[in-house]
Design a protein with these regions (language model features):
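Composition-driven detection of intrinsically disordered, low-complexity segments
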Residues: 46-51, 110
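Amphipathic alpha-helical binding modules
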Residues: 69-115
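Amphipathic alpha-helical interaction surfaces
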Residues: 49-60, 78-81, 85
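Compositionally biased, low-complexity segments enriched in small residues
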Residues: 8-11, 42, 56-57, 74
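Charged, low-complexity interaction regions
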Residues: 26-41, 58-66, 88-95
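Short, aromatic- and cysteine-enriched interfacial helices/patches
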Residues: 1-8, 63, 113-115
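Short terminal alpha-helical segments
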Residues: 2-38
Length: 115
């Protein structure tokens, strides 16, 4: 389906989308529990953009443009930073927490089937 470079880019972008989306939902829940309006607005805005990027990626064989890839990479760094300030981080790592139930290969295959 892809050359090696495109396959790696596909996996990287889809991993970033998944982790940022699921962490954003987690962080939004924390913000809502503490009634932190600034954080609620921040995560709602980020989740809306991630959703748009996810939908756009499905129209482009799972690959995003360079700027969107940079955005997700920077957002993932922010997500990790916030995650490691939570109690959950004492139990497991960011990567071990935000992983699809069926594993990455099944997740990637599900995405490919949506093209």
């Amino acid at each position: 389906m892809f050359g090696f470079g495109k396959a790696k880019l596909f996996q990287t972008h889809q991993t970033l989308l998944y982790q940022c989306m699921h962490f954003g939902e987690f962080a939004l829940g924390l913000a809502q529990e503490s009634a932190d309006e600034d954080q609620i607005e921040f995560w709602e805005t980020k989740l809306a953009r991630i959703t748009k990027l996810r939908d756009a990626s499905l129209r482009k064989n799972g690959i995003l443009d360079k700027e969107d890839g940079y955005f997700l990479d920077a957002l993932r760094e922010k997500c990790e930073e916030v995650f490691y300030k939570t109690e959950l981080s004492k139990q497991q790592s960011f990567d071990d927490t935000f992983i699809p139930d069926g594993g990455w290969e099944d997740h990637f295959e599900d995405i490919r089937s949506n093209f």
